[in-house]
């Protein structure tokens, strides 16, 4: 494994910290396709979900290679790098941290080797029983101190899951997953792989979105339907809460590891998801527009102009204007070269980002009573 200055990684590093809550995950199983490039474009479509780091793991049936680094997807990967990642299966990740350092060591996918193979895992979510999982890893390490799958101590929720899945080399990955998944508490949408098979799982509440798509010669799993659109995959369905998927040369297999208790995060509709994404059969754009209409009915005001805070606020502002009969207009100019300010890792950076990102059209708004959505 090279130093953090390099890009290729074949193991976890000590000291990896921090849950990942609003990240983007993407996986593809497609023999004969350029899976690294499909994953690159899928992550590009999910870039809004995380801008700190990006990574892709590719398997060719005999080994897994992981490439990850700090930065945006287009900064981490170039044509030469993508051309070097050959295989029939891939998983990718773009990271936003809810806590912990924004450093190379925390980039995903995570990776672990075992005596029978390897696993690469990408996680969108935040587990709340990390202490229990750490104890399980410690017991596993104590029971098999020489096992090749147990090397560095795990220090984040994602690392712990990777350790637990990789720590049972005498069992199949499917069997290990169906044993581990019911022990997890919190939010998780996983996309992971061994050398031959693509796996996906979603927590029983379905906190974070996860969808299944079909290519002409394969399958895709992604955080949002917009990523399926970009790579030319057709939507099959959502991965159900409490469902586990396995995809290989024998096709698609599904198992339920927990009873579904749907409780999706409303912030996906409000901010996190792309407006051209569909969640639970409903357009995010339409949902935001209806939120604006509802706001106008429940909190009516007299105003001269309705303006959005671009981009997430635009559909809601349009809905408010249409419902209230108040004129709609642009009052804030967005700098398209500044990333999403809410998901920056510190409050100081967020405040600087807002000043860089938005500037008022003074001639439009000066002296007017405004509704800012």
Cite the ranges covered by each PLM segment:
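Short, glycine/charge-rich flexible loops or terminal/linker lids adjacent to PRPP-binding catalytic cores
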Residues: 325-371
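Extended, hydrophobic alpha-helical segments in both membrane/secreted and soluble proteins
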Residues: 306, 313-320, 324, 328, ...
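Amphipathic alpha-helical
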Residues: 160-172, 310, 321-340
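Conserved short alpha-helical segments that host acidic/polar catalytic motifs at enzyme active sites
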Residues: 1-241, 246-303, 309
């Amino acid at each position: 494994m090279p130093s953090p200055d390099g890009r290729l990684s074949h193991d976890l590093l000590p000291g990896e910290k921090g849950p990942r809550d609003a990240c983007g995950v993407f996986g593809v199983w497609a023999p004969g396709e350029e899976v690294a490039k499909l994953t690159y474009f899928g992550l590009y479509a999910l870039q809004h979900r995380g801008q700190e780091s990006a990574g892709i793991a590719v398997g060719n049936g005999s080994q897994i290679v992981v490439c990850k680094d700090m930065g945006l997807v287009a900064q981490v990967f170039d044509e030469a790098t993508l051309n070097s990642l050959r295989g029939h299966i891939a998983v990718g990740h773009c990271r936003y941290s809810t806590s912990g350092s924004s450093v190379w060591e925390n980039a995903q996918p995570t990776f672990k080797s075992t005596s029978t193979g390897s696993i690469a895992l990408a996680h969108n979510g935040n587990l709340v029983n990390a202490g229990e999982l750490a104890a399980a890893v410690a017991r596993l390490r104590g029971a098999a101190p020489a096992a090749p799958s147990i090397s560095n101590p795990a220090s984040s929720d994602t690392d712990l899951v990777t350790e637990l899945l990789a720590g049972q080399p005498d069992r199949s990955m499917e069997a290990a997953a169906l044993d581990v998944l019911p022990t997890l508490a919190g939010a998780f949408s996983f996309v992971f792989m061994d050398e031959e098979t693509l796996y996906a799982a979603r927590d029983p509440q379905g906190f974070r979105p996860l969808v299944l798509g079909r290519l002409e010669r394969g399958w895709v799993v992604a955080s949002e339907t917009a990523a399926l659109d970009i790579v030319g995959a057709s939507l099959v369905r959502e991965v159900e809460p409490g469902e586990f998927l396995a995809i290989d040369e024998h096709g698609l297999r599904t198992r339920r590891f927990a009873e579904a208790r749907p409780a999706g995060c409303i912030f996906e509709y409000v901010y996190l998801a792309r407006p051209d994404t569909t969640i639970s059969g409903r357009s995010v754009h339409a949902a935001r527009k209806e939120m604006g209409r509802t706001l106008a009915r429940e909190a009516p005001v007299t105003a001269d102009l309705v303006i959005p805070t671009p981009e997430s606020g635009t559909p809601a502002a349009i809905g408010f204007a249409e419902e209230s009969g108040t004129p709609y207009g642009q009052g804030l100019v967005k700098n398209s070269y500044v990333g999403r300010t809410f998901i920056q890792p510190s409050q100081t950076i967020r405040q600087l980002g807002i000043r860089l990102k938005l500037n008022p059209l003074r001639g439009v708004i000066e002296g007017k009573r405004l509704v800012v959505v």
